[in-house]
């Protein structure tokens, strides 16, 4: 890539926006040049970035407010905008070619395309999208074509499930399957019981309940892996942990396989083509052991179980914040390289 850093901007400085910024600032192939958030002042942005209840205090460069429109990470200036309408954010002024759309609001293609009017060349939506093409790194990123300007990084759960499902389907064939994600609290939930008109259960106190919830993550696997379209569905339990989630994938296999054979295949893939995306562990781990893990999916060999050679339950962990944010940056690099060719 000739040492030229890819310039990125972030729209929305929430959980994912801030962590994408943390990932970007620790890498030497991308450069954060701008952040837009109309709801946070520059000094508050600094505080929210520096102190993080889950991932700890920022220790890499000193962070200062230069003025109301500029943050300094060490000596490096990052321009701050506070614009509500994405069409009006002047990304072009800062040289930001790639914009991470992490507000959770502009998730469809037309709304995300507003960033192109401000000078961005490509937009990466950090959420599933109903009409923008979804790419899961390690699964279908090779299908990206340079004429696509708006892409979705899917969801954190799809990023955990899809690599595992791909490995199993490629080697043994999946007849059908059900997924459950035991998922940490996210920002949409309530600290105490409150109104949530579309999802009554979701309005109950997050820190006090196990809350059944819907998720499109399993069905979305069918979009990134067409061979599995219509073969997977799933649901979620929201539980009172602040980060790290775990997927339970229960599948019926076409080809007979012992649990030992399945483990061996996943281990081989985790050390081969999917290294850095799919992990493998035989340790006696629990959820907090994965805080800050940048892989999409870490298969827990000891937690899974087989009923017989055609019916198995597979368990895979993911840091739903950090792993996902790491993939956002990876996807930017993939899009950039395809666009250069």
Curated annotation (Swiss-Prot):
It is an enzyme of class 1 (oxidoreductase). Keywords: Cytoplasm, Glycolysis, NAD, Oxidoreductase. The active site is at 156 (nucleophile). One of its GO terms (biological process) is glycolytic process. It catalyses: D-glyceraldehyde 3-phosphate + phosphate + NAD(+) = (2R)-3-phospho-glyceroyl phosphate + NADH + H(+). Key enzyme in glycolysis that catalyzes the first step of the pathway by converting D-glyceraldehyde 3-phosphate (G3P) into 3-phospho-D-glyceroyl phosphate. Essential for the maintenance of cellular ATP levels and carbohydrate metabolism. Belongs to the glyceraldehyde-3-phosphate dehydrogenase family. Homotetramer. This is Glyceraldehyde-3-phosphate dehydrogenase, cytosolic.
